[in-house]
Amino acid sequence: MIKTLFNKNTALAAVAILALSGSAMAESAKTHKTDMAKKKVSELTCEDFNGLEESFKPTVVGWVVGFNKKGKEEDAVIDVDGIETVTPAIIEACKQEPKASFWKKAEAELKKVF
């Protein structure tokens, strides 16, 4: 089983960089991603998550898995196989309710897997 090390600062930097990248995006998409990069993860909606590139969604899910239950930053070992299993479920849940809290949807799906 492959394990990966994440911490809050690394994940947030990655979210900001990837959310702001991509020169071929439409202007409205750039505005959406810029706004998203300014939000706390607890403020993200499923709509924000749905707007990410598919290849980046497992990284965001991995960060959520690594965040401790008290909401404080903590280094964590991540189960990559588990993330690959739960990411499609989170994507589907967010497609069903785009205005819902991404954090709450992710937590609900994570409880089913971890």
Swiss-Prot record:
Subcellular location: Periplasm
Annotated disulfide bonds: C46-C94
Biological process according to GO: cellular stress response to acidic pH
Record-linked InterPro entries: HdeA, HdeA/HdeB_sf, HdeA_sf, HNS-dep_expression_A/B
Gene Ontology cellular-component annotations: outer membrane-bounded periplasmic space
Record's signal peptide: 1-26
Keywords noted in UniProt: Chaperone, Disulfide bond, Periplasm, Signal
Gene3D superfamilies documented for this protein: HNS-dependent expression A (1.10.890.10)
Primary subcellular site in the record, as a coarse category: periplasm
Function: Required for optimal acid stress protection. Exhibits a chaperone-like activity only at low pH by suppressing non-specifically the aggregation of denaturated periplasmic proteins.
Protein family per UniProt: Belongs to the HdeA family.
Protein name, entry field: Probable acid stress chaperone HdeA
Organism: Brucella ovis (strain ATCC 25840 / 63/290 / NCTC 10512)
Taxonomic placement: Bacteria, Pseudomonadati, Pseudomonadota, Alphaproteobacteria, Hyphomicrobiales
Chain's gene name: hdeA
